[in-house]
Amino acid sequence: MAKGVNQIINNIRLRKLRKILNQINALSEEFSNFSDEALQAKTKEFKVYLNDNKASLNHILPQAYATVREASKRVLGMYPKDVQILGAIAMHQGNIAEMQTGEGKTLTATMPLYLNALTGKGAYLITTNDYLAKRDFLEMKPLYEWLGLSVSLGFVDIPEYEYAENEKYELYHHDIVYTTNGRLGFDYLIDNLADDIRAKFLPKLNFAIIDEVDSIILDAAQTPLVISGAPRVQSNLFHIVKKFVETLEKDKDFIVNFNKKEVWLTDEGSEKASHYFKVNSIYQQQYFDLVRMIHLSLRAKYLFKYNLDYFIFDGEIVLIDRITGRMLPGTKLQSGLHQAIEALENVEISQDMSVMATITFQNLFKQFDEFSGMTGTGKLGEKEFFDLYSKVVIEIPTHSPIERDDRPDRVFANGDKKNDAILKTVIGIHETQQPVLLITRTAEAAEYFSAELFKRDIPNNLLIAQNVAKEAQMIAEAGQLSAVTVATSMAGRGTDIKLSKEVHDIGGLAVIINEHMDNSRVDRQLRGRSGRQGDPGYSQIFVSLDDDLVKRWSNSNLAENKNLQTMDASKLESSALFKKRVKSIVNKAQRVSEETAMKNREMANEFEKSISVQRDKIYAERNHILEASDFDDFNFEQLARDVFTKDVKNLDLSSERALVNYIYENLSFVFDEDVSNINMQNDEEIIQFLIQQFTQQFNNRLEVAADSYLKLRFIQKSILKAIDSEWIEQVDNLQQLKASVNNRQNGQRNVIFEYHKVALETYEYMSEDIKRKMVRNLCLSILAFDKDGDMVIHFP
């Protein structure tokens, strides 16, 4: 019933898009008769029209799309099909276009990118990795340039490349920019750490199309981008706590909730810890760090798996993205968790760095005036797209009917019998010369199947995170005659597997999946490796009762039935009742997994709200300071009065010594005036005296700065230094606080409410500390000039 209603709604949306499509098609013949010069001149015509008439882009959409369509035919030899036009219209309107593998999403995106770039405000195509961004940029660059638009790759594809001054500015200030979500996110954070308007390089974020949008803003939504700063004081407890954790018994001394990714000590475990570390109670205030370390060690040991969440490369822990199977080099878990895993694996413990800046992909893309996306599996995430981003998903029909045969699951009592059946199936397919792609959940399983196939004289390509450099080549070869490719769920997403004619004739690509993934969208993505653009092929998932999905997310005890474990595998597989029961267990487990993941993303989004609001306010204030041409209207005396009024109230400045010490610390290193004539019982008299000292010291520094530009730079840098030092500390504190409240077992206490309450309190404290730092910087900084005559500021 629900499926039928959804289809009706989708058809209504498509009807609206087809009305616009008909307008574009009506222009096809006219535009095909244009000379190259006339067609190229359209870009300038559109820009002039938009500027002169202040018109919306919708007014010129049919003509703009007809222009790109005809230009694509002439420049690329590709003429966008009607279904691609539908997807392009949907994306310009800010929707998610669900387009199946091989339907030409790269070409589809050129139309809304071109249209939105006509405003002069820029348009981005954002994808998941460098290879895809560079590939799409190189393929589409001739089209944009022929039409008179500038296009760039938003990064230099050289490892450890150091950008020259203004180089990033040049890369980003093009009409159209191709980049990745990770690179754009880090550049956004870096741009907002600039202390000079000339060091900023990002333009205002106008319009973006996100490729594989569900992977980026749903699956990766909980992964924050983090820029690290100075190292924290390193604890020496990691190895000691690791040894203690090894003495604990699961379910007796601690409880693990794998689904919620939580772990905590029981009363017995707490007593054991107190006894082990020879303290009265580990929950005394002075042992807070010890409790934190115990929880970190437990999380490292029980919630993170080698070869699934991380692996060891060159003696270092390298994280793996569970969803894509890709390595995340240079990325570290925060708040000491990375170091706990290093201790667990006996590798050298790295420095735990403080957090300078952070943002999630959810909030990164909310910085755009508008964004849309495309994916092959959007419908399954439609509710979340709407709840989090107010985006609807429009299912775009395929140009050719999907010929792939998605066969029913094959079910087994245990993993050993299932693995034997998978190997027999792959060998059987290989004997027919039909190419096969075997996809596994983990790198460990992929390595096992690859090795077993080699033992049976079946040559194969192994594609896992550790050899991702060969990904594109392996995937390109996966559709060749007799090819066998074993891969994790990364499986070359975004890269088409093209079939030779011989392979097409013998049934296309066979996709064998060794277990259901936690998310039905990922299952669909993996099946979609076969059957592109009406190609033949088939997919099949093999299931056992001890699959990770079933063990983690199902409470069924069917796997413990000894009769099932001893039954002949073929008889069991042919049992309709058994298959029905297992299908029900798997479907329910996957549903629970998806619901839990959605709740976790909602929770992450709730946690992010506080820091998001604070970050937006801080970044807006920084930009206001950077863009200021003078500070003539800024009331510095009122700033000083606010600070001194609070300090006189909260600090004991009622003695001459206390007042002089305060002046040394905040206003002047060389103060030598007599304060004996000040009435120490009169707060206003003390405040007036401090304001007088502030004004004198501030003016002294302005005199050193000499000209108006240097005075401006001194004030800007002093204020920014105050904001940044306190904001960096606030961000780090909020990261630590989030980790702390996640570890607490607070009964009915709402941890989100608690987090927001503390976050607001600390923000208010931070705001006062920023003012105090501003006063100190304006009074205590030392201004000097280097041999080139450039001003150098030494802050207190």
Swiss-Prot record:
Task: Provide GO CC annotations from the record.
Answer: cell envelope Sec protein transport complex; cytosol; plasma membrane
Q: Which CDD domains has this protein been placed in?
A: DEXDc_SecA, SF2_C_secA
Family annotation (Gene3D superfamilies):
Helical scaffold and wing domains of SecA, P-loop containing nucleotide triphosphate hydrolases, SecA, preprotein cross-linking domain
Q: Enzyme group, top EC level?
A: translocase
InterPro entries, from UniProt?
Helicase_ATP-bd, Helicase_C-like, P-loop_NTPase, SecA, SecA2, SecA_DEAD, SecA_motor_DEAD, SecA_preprotein_X-link_dom
Key words of the record = ATP-binding, Cell membrane, Cytoplasm, Membrane, Nucleotide-binding, Protein transport, Translocase, Translocation, Transport
Mention one GO molecular function. ATP binding
Q: Which residues does ATP bind?
A: Q84, G102, E103, G104, K105, T106, D496
Q: Which Pfam families match?
A: P-loop_SecA, SecA_DEAD, SecA_PP_bind, SecA_SW
Q: How does it sit in the membrane?
A: Peripheral membrane protein
Tell me where it resides.
Answer: Cell membrane; Cytoplasm
Name the Gene Ontology biological process terms.
Answer: intracellular protein transmembrane transport; protein import; protein targeting; protein transport by the Sec complex
Q: List its EC numbers.
A: 7.4.2.8
- Catalytic reaction list: ATP + H2O + cellular proteinSide 1 = ADP + phosphate + cellular proteinSide 2
Q: Which domain of life is it from?
A: Bacteria
PANTHER family, per the entry = CHLOROPLAST PROTEIN-TRANSPORTING ATPASE, SECA INNER MEMBRANE COMPONENT OF SEC PROTEIN SECRETION SYSTEM
The family classification in the record reads: Belongs to the SecA family.
State how it assembles: Monomer and homodimer. Part of the essential Sec protein translocation apparatus which comprises SecA, SecYEG and auxiliary proteins SecDF. Other proteins may also be involved.
Q: Which NCBIfam families match?
A: PRK09200.1 (NF006630), secA2 (TIGR03714)
What is the recorded function of this protein according to its Swiss-Prot or TrEMBL entry?
Part of the Sec protein translocase complex. Interacts with the SecYEG preprotein conducting channel. Has a central role in coupling the hydrolysis of ATP to the transfer of proteins into and across the cell membrane, serving as an ATP-driven molecular motor driving the stepwise translocation of polypeptide chains across the membrane.
Q: Any idea what this protein is called?
A: Protein translocase subunit SecA 2
The species is Staphylococcus epidermidis (strain ATCC 12228 / FDA PCI 1200)
